[in-house]
Amino acid sequence: AVLPGLLGGPFNHAIAGVAVGLKEVNTPQFKEYAQQVVKNAQHLANELITKYQFNVVSGGTDKHLVLIDLTNKNVPGRFFSKALDHAGIVSNYNTIPGDLKPPLNPSGLRIGTPWITTRGMKEEQITQIASWMDQVLKICQEDRYQGIKFKDFKIEIKQNIEIQRIAKEVKQLCLQFPLDI
């Protein structure tokens, strides 16, 4: 005899989670959400390219993330990602095609749009986020941060008044778009 709970192994909760997820992605609301995620990423890439002269790998995106080549900005991805983090903007440092730098200190930065789309943000807010990213980058390009060791950079960038100002503005934006948990 086969009884419920004796079949499927110790991961029935994972199987149930997959089932719920598959049901959710089969709705018109999810399709609309997924399309907005891509629109937001495309808008972010376009803003960074056209207004702030960032080099976006492949010239744009057709998915949920933007991969930025920072070689023309003279700021390593690891440093920029940490500065963005202190400003309240989540990103990852990332290698880029043909990167000459090591994986722990690469030339690229990856940023995605699912979280902000989940909050309800659209193109108008993306325009502001791109502006903040450029402001943070300009702070990272200041002479005082050139040639600095990462452990020292982490401390100094956290104390930067402009980074703190941007973090407050980011927080205010997020408060307008609370997570519905």
What is each of the regions a protein language model found here?
Residues 4, 24-27, 72, 86-90, ...:
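Short, well-ordered loop/turn and helix-capping segments at boundaries between secondary-structure elements
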Residues 5, 9, 25, 29, ...:
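Short secondary-structure junctions and interdomain/linker hinges
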Residues 35, 82, 127:
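Short alpha-helical basic/polar micro-motif
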